[in-house]
Amino acid sequence: MFERPLKLTHNDNHRVYFTSDTHFNHDKPFIYEARGYKNRVEHNDALIAKINEVVRPEDTLIHLGDFCLNITPPEFNEILARINCQNIAYIWGNHNSCIRKHYEDAVAGHLNMVRFTGNSPNDGIEVYPYAIGKLTYLGYYKELIVNGHMIVIHHYPHQIFNQMQKGAWQLSGHSHYTNPTTQVDYPDNKILDVGWDGHGKPLSFPEIQKIMLNKNHVKQDKHH
């Protein structure tokens, strides 16, 4: 299966934002206290308020994994309902249990499977994307073209990625902004951790574009 990049346009009528690792409902102090909150409820409320302050209902919010932890399906649906944005695209992270129930109940049974091994109808590749309500599941990896610019998105940062030799960007999360090579001020790649711990809000395409202009195009492989 050959999958074309997803094309999006950022303009005054429709803006594109990116974030990762919100960890809604995470009940461990090392998450919410590090972000300046007393408990998970205060943490949830603050993150929802900030998202709604930045992202409009008509915009697109692309979330690169680890949306939430330790949450029941009703709690998950409540948080999702409180986020005003009506178009949230989701990349799988490594903490998927909270969103897995929603996915299995509403999505998995409707996905097409490309079978290439084994005898089970579930042996194969899930064909993305699939949308249910305001959530679109994009799988573990996706290539985007936003305003004509190539962006590779996934949860985990990678040193080498498609089209990097032509100036493509990579957006990721996972490290909670502890990896210096994926931070704003690191000059020697066009890779950025868009996670909440680094920015405290979703980043817009123009904000990311400004950051990437200050990063060097470094060729890491032989595709020069």
Provide a role label for each language-model segment.
Residues 1-38, 193-224:
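Acidic, histidine-bearing metal-coordination/catalytic regions of metal-dependent phosphoesterases
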Residues 3-4, 47-50, 74-79, 138-140, ...:
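A generic local structural motif
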Residues 11, 49-50, 56, 145, ...:
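Residue-level detector of transmembrane insertion/anchoring sites
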Residues 13, 58, 85-87, 148, ...:
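A general structural motif
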Residues 17-19, 24-138:
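Core catalytic region of metal-dependent phosphoesterases/phosphodiesterases
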Residues 108-222:
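Conserved beta-sheet core of the metallophosphoesterase superfamily
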